[in-house]
């Protein structure tokens, strides 16, 4: 039978971080016929699998949509690139592999937006459901899930120096940012298994790819939903310039991410009526919240040249063979290193209060932006990336045309909020004090912000900013949002959104683990028909 004639129980749009989880859980019921559609292709590339090659994946159109935003007036009209996975595993195939869940109160506060059933006690079991933690099994961790989480497979003395300097500055040492408290400094855990990236494709999709009731189609462009009498009955795609329809007798689940999901809704007639009419699209549901509430963590890089060897010098040709063999046979060494080896979480006003800043620490430095080639300096250096965790700044995503091949209009100014900018100034001043503390200070040759006043630090911020690459919130749950608390699109039957876009407020930390949790909880809602 032609796939276009099959009546699918579930059609999942996007084989990304959430989509792979959903495909696994929904197809576990043998009577469910599940169709998974993806614009990209398999994640078989070695660039995805090898942690040290992550910069060669990020921002590459083979794997990444590379959406470009409108000029940012707060940064001299820079046009930021908003990465979004275009490959099996989505963002989990591109990201820095850092396993952070956020803070307990992040989820408890979602209730303030009219969201029920998502407090920390509600979501913890779904974090545990996916997790297979190599190192710990406690009330906060599990060793029974498909997703492997591991400690670092490589250490560098600068890791310990950073941790000790932070402790001397006043931060407690923290061996588990996903346990009792996030506050403090310590080494990260990573989405890795045997020194390889562990994305949701390798953990959830590939092990079940041969299930008879699951069909995965790659390389297709999602155009729009087919809606009749306020009910989704199918999906229209473009496959090699040919329009095709797939029929749904159950639910369609949007898992196209915080840029892709609102665009599909808008092209389908769900969104701000004025935008839809402007683009000659029939209005199915007038909801101005679609595409609004775009959030990310604004960040700033600082590079510190040092007087000892870092991975910059270890990756030179005379040493890379040794490290390559170590990784190949042991899954360890510098090649297994995630994007950061340590993190520090603190409050920019009172250091031990609820963290609103996160420092990513790496015993290597690199020069990179999504539009430029990755460059690893040949001198030894440290790189830190400091993010504001509770940003006030919000943007939006809108379609530029009903043509699915046209890019979106992304409006987001990284430093539109003076409070965010002030918090970053405070965060960098605290970081500068940490890097001036023993024992790490004896290795630092230049501390870039130590002699700058607040005005100069603001200029430094605007010249060294980056997106946290944690786009969230554009199809959010809540009273004023797009979805109800069960992830169903309001005023339309048989349609849910399950990805990072559902968060009413971005969590305080890296978002990948939370998206996997959302997918686990969403799958449970679907299977229980809630």
Predicted regions mapped to residue ranges:
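N-terminal glycine-rich phosphate/pyrophosphate-binding loop and immediately adjacent elements
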Residues: 2-128, 287, 297-306
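Residue-level detector of alpha-helix initiation sites
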Residues: 12, 16-21, 153, 258-259, ...
